[in-house]
Every structure is written in C-alpha cells, then in structure tokens.
A protein has these predicted regions:
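Adenine nucleotide-associated cytosolic modules
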Residues: 1-169
Length: 169
C-alpha cells in the first residue's frame, strides 16, 4: 500500500471487512475552500489528520456548524483524544487545550518524529469507541477533557480543561 492514497486504501480495507458499508471518499486536501461542503452533511466528524493546521481548521468549522468532533493526535508513543459536541455551548474546543500560536507542525510532526503503530491503533480505536458511544447514546464522552495516552510508560489519564472564548477564522 506504499505510495497509494490513504483514502483509497482505507476504503478498500473497509469494503473487505463489510461489503455493505457505504463509503464516500474525498481525494483532495482539506482546506478552507472545501471543508464546509465536505462536513456539512455529517453529524459526527472523526479527525485523523496528521497536522495541527488541519486539526484547527476542522475544529473551527465543526464549531461554526455545531457538529460533534472526535479528534486524535499522535507522536511516537504518545496520543491525545478529545471529544467535542459543539451543539452544547458549554463544550470547550481544541483551541482551549492547544494554543494555536504555540503549536507548530515542526514541533508535532509524525513524518519527523515517527509514529508507533500501536499508538495510532489505540488512539484510532478510542476515537471509534467515542463515536459509537455518541451514536448509541451511552456512556460518558470526554467532554472538556483530554485522554492522554503514554504507551512508553503505559499511562492513561484524563485531564479536565475549561472552555475559553476564542475567535474562529
């Protein structure tokens, strides 16, 4: 699967697991010109992007469109998972945890830092579990919390953070 588009590989693998699955793929880079068209018809957005510019863009549009957002970030042995329901005005935002000016793709770069496969797997599985809980309406999501995963030392912890107002682009 090297040098193949991730979206094509993912769609193929999902169809192998369940051929009845309806999959809509987008083969363009997500940007401010196409994001609204892409996410407007979905209730829950699961973000697996690998850079903070895209994560902040998704966060801003989910906030504007009042979507539910589950986002994950990974680097080496570390992972972060957030769940936001922007229909609820008390929900914090990704920018309440990560300060946009303090985060650069140079500091958190999967291509440079590398990613351990199990880190991606655990963060992705946790995001899928959060989505299932939202769909079914059971359990507690990570509202105004971050799940911090440290696989090197096998630590999992939740940290609360507060909502602060910020201006979207």
């Amino acid at each position: 699967d090297v040098k193949k588009l991730k979206v094509n590989v993912a769609a193929k693998k999902l169809k192998e697991i369940n051929p009845l699955t309806k999959i809509k793929t987008y083969k363009s880079k997500l940007d401010s010109k196409n994001i609204k068209k892409i996410i407007k018809n979905y209730e829950i957005i699961v973000d697996g992007s690998d850079n903070f510019e895209t994560k902040f863009l998704i966060n801003d549009y989910c906030l504007k469109l009042k979507k539910k957002l589950i986002t994950g970030a990974i680097s080496k042995f570390d992972g972060h998972v957030f769940t936001f329901n922007f229909k609820d005005k008390k929900t914090a935002s990704l920018k309440n945890f990560y300060q946009e000016k303090q985060i650069s793709n140079d500091n958190f770069n999967c291509e440079f830092d590398g990613v351990i496969g199990t880190t991606a797997s655990i963060v992705g599985t946790t995001q899928a579990n959060e989505a299932l809980k939202m769909i079914v309406g059971i359990g507690k999501n990570l509202k105004n919390q971050i799940l911090i995963i440290d696989l090197l030392n096998l630590n999992f912890r939740k940290v609360k953070f507060k909502k602060k107002w910020y201006k979207t682009k």
